Amino acid sequence: MLNFLYTILIYPVYMFVDFMLFAADTLTRGNIGVSIVILSVGINLVCLPMYNMAEKLQEKERDVQAGMKSMIDRIKAVFKGDEQYMILSAYYREKGYRPVYALRAMFPLFIQIPFFMAAYSILSSLPALRFTSFLCFNDLSLPDGLLHIGAVQINIMPIVMTAVNIAASAVYTKDLAIKDKAQLYVIAFIFLALLYNSPSGLVLYWTLNNVFSLVKNIFYRIKLKPKTWYKITVVALICLTIITAILTRPTLSDRRKPVMIMASLTIIAALIPFMLKILRSLDEKFPQTIFDDNKKRFSVFLLSAASLAVFAGLTLPSAVIASSPQEFSNFDGFKNPLGILYYSFTQSLGCLFWFICLYKLFSGTVQKHLARLSVVVLVCALINVFLFKGNYGDISNTLIFENEAMLKSSMKYFALNIFTLGAGCAITLIILYSNLSRFMPSITGILLLSFFASVGISSVSIQKEYLYLTKIKAVDSNINQKAYRVSKTGKNIFIFMLDRGVNFFIEPIFENSEIVRNAYTGFTLFENSVTFTTGTVGSTPSLFGGYEYTPENINKRSDELLVDKHNEALSVLPRLFSEQGWNVSFTDPSWLNYSYIYDLSPFKKYDMIAQNTSEKYREYSVDRLSSNNKDGNGITGLRRNMLYFAYFRILPSELRRIFYLGGRGHYAGNTPMQDIKLPFIKAYNALTKLTDEVNFIESGNCLNIIVNETTHEPILAEDVVTLHKDFLVQLAKKYCLNKYTEEHFYVNYLTHEELAKFFTFLKENNCYDNSRIIIVSDHGRYGMEMNGMTWLPKFKNAGFDVQWAIPLMMIKDFDAHGELKKDNTFMTIADTPILAVSDLPEELQINPFSGKTFKETQDKKIVKTMHGIFWDATKQRNLTRFAQVQDLWAYVHDNVYDPDNWSWGRTKRE
């Protein structure tokens, strides 16, 4: 219950303060001291109308109390006990007063409490304050310690804060009763006790709040007119613009953006009178609308705001989870992914609660504008979500985008977005100021119901997928059994499938890693190789089953489900080798049974070991993950990001990028993400545990197929430092031409380093020479740009990034030795089974499902490959074919680095 109340009452304020700090920090380009100043001024200006309304209620209560005081005093003097209570109650009823109204006198304090809690939570542990000096403060994360008397350190700023607070209270309580004065003075000293040893950045913020309160109280005593207040606000914005220009970084290019933003805010403030004049004229021109009725006006506001809250807190999050329920299952503390919706919805309800409170504080005129504004915002949200979805690439199950460069929108797209929003707003306002506005309650009510219906549909889909997941029975009942068997005297074949492993990194890795050079002896790199699709679902069947399972050949078997053909392809080598008496192991098979969480049931029929090693070490992975990314309010990871992702979707295209990337963390966050994503840790842990999973046997032959996704999960430079691999940051910059390539370089380097340790382990146990080792990836990756790629500019007009089509292919044969060799033979990933069975007995050359040899089905004169494929296999269980859109197909022959050998769409170049 306490968590629920915190989420409803406090967390929305925390979000607001956090966002204001994000905006200020973005404005000042990381000058956290100035950001705190702007934060204080900004919050006080934004909250000023709310404070004024609260103080009016407080003043009203004092007037009522003063009017009743003489009679109450007489009653208390004459009557005692129950009789006094009855007489007072009768008197209150006569005056239309209830004792609970006394709480109105506490409204300003009630407003301050959540803002104080939010600011304290954020600024007391903000990483940006550490080692940051500002004005007379050496470190904003520590108490100021400005005065030393002998060995005693005295913090001056809390004392200054208290003095200003007392001065503000003295001005405010002039002519008031002693109890009113005492109340504020006691509160001032309570804050002194609470904040005396707090970070100077936090004390600075609260001191500035008190200064603002003092100035406000002085002007309040002067009884300024609203126009004067408005002029003061404009002057304050002008001053802030000048201060921003002076205190931000000195170069013109660095300060242009903050100054332009502040200037824009000033211009907007200057235009407010004209906007209000337009609104008044519209009200006069269309006087009889639904917004003149208090109840109907509130119903429009409530239904619109509630629709927006449900849309952001339930509809969008449920749609995200429903897109891939298995990825959100058993993750981040959630067993059933439906539990995620509780957090996003309660946070959204909290925002709705505060919006309703604000609405009720204002006069009828302001309520009219707020009601109309709620409808306009809802319309804008729908336009952005459904008409301007954007294509931002892959996103993790913590809702972190993999390639941040894709967040940038073209000016043309953004202009179209803004134009559409403008048109939508204009049409909406025309309706709101016409007689058609009478339909608004019905329209918003229908929208609200439709959002709930959408949530229901998504929830059914999520629950269905979750129940399917719970029924998966992995063939690793002996989970404590070691996953791999390695023969001391027989033959060993290892196939390492590195999901999204990149070919282009091999040379720099060999140049800079001594352990890789020494361990990877006898390897040959096939640089001139090609895959069949951009995604794992379409490429792995051919990798494990050969040419009979290319996307084109799979589509020819149109009377069979894709999932069955996929399972068959992944079963080719296990069935073939196990039936010939080999010891077979297959770990983490890609999308087996079209399940994100490995469903090993298709392997039940074979004599083999099948395990999910990444999940085997899940607990160890979670332990490594849990020590990072904590913040003051405990709402982190998916609990925070889900609602923020919904807000991301609601924003216009280019503002999404600023909202996501503008702060020190993701989604307007002020705390850098310090956790390495769990999928990487699970896959990387499985690599580091390879040697622990080996069971040496004295005789027999062994086939070990090992799928690993470390290369599929690029990590940040900060994560590399966390792993104590700092040298990789500069090494990646030396070879890579963009951040996205650097992030892939990190994980590829780490992968080959761990494989090198495993190969060294095999050598130490005399099992390297009798091993054939194949390292292959299912596909490459778009956006990979490195020094020395002289061929890449030739593909500028290709229409897609050819880098995804070039996979990693390497082999070390039995008894092979020497340095790395390069082979430019034209290869495809479907050659993997041929390489695996090369020079083995004839019975091992045949696909056990078709009866054909791998060699006879080999066809790579012209390779037909797909450069676009729907990758989410959980949505393809009832399909029999991959996409048939001709424009998605590409053709290549002989040399993948020559654009003349490529053709696209319907044109096939011989």
Predicted features along the sequence, with ranges:
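A long, amphipathic alpha-helix that forms part
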Residues: 440, 451, 474-489, 678-697, ...
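Histidine-centered active-site microenvironments of extracellular/periplasmic hydrolases
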Residues: 524-528, 604, 763-770, 774-817
